[in-house]
A protein has these predicted regions:
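Strongly charged
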Residues: 1-56, 63-143
Length: 143
């Protein structure tokens, strides 16, 4: 069975020229979410481990990834990809003037690896009108 990535068409205007007619672009639309419980169930069906074991490992992975990123490490998840912290803020004229108070924001960068990049090359697309509405409840154990 073919899998299709859904998209809708949205108008985007140039913020510097709001009076100019915008152009229409594709915007990916989620069909739903795959939470930790569903992912654990799917993985269980592919392996010899139980769903509970998979969930335990994934929850531990969350903690280890967060700790590694906080320690300034690049987290490499095999061919899935890598995560790294990136900083943004104000600049100074000289290196000596710079101090950590000028750092305004930290964010996490994800770079897809071979597995995800290969998937991108096989995508097929389906145009939809309606946007996905997020579920009210979070799919987390114990919540």
């Amino acid at each position: 069975m073919d899998k299709y990535l859904t998209y809708s068409v949205v108008e985007r205007k140039d913020p510097s020229s709001p009076e100019v007619q915008g152009k229409y672009y594709a915007q990916a639309q989620a069909r739903g979410e795959a939470g930790i419980r569903e992912m654990s169930q799917r993985i269980q069906q592919m392996c010899t481990v139980t769903r509970a074991d998979v969930m335990a490992v994934l929850i531990a992975l969350e903690d280890v990834v967060a700790d590694s990123l906080a320690n300034g490490e690049i987290v490499r998840l095999g061919e899935l990809g890598s995560l790294q912290v990136s900083l943004s803020g104000s600049g100074t004229v000289t290196k000596e003037e710079y101090h950590d108070g000028l750092i305004e924001k930290a964010k996490i960068l994800f770079r897809g690896g071979k597995t995800l990049n290969n998937m991108l090359g096989t995508l097929k697309f389906e145009k939809v009108d309606q946007k996905y509405k997020k579920k009210e409840e979070e799919d987390r154990p114990g919540v």
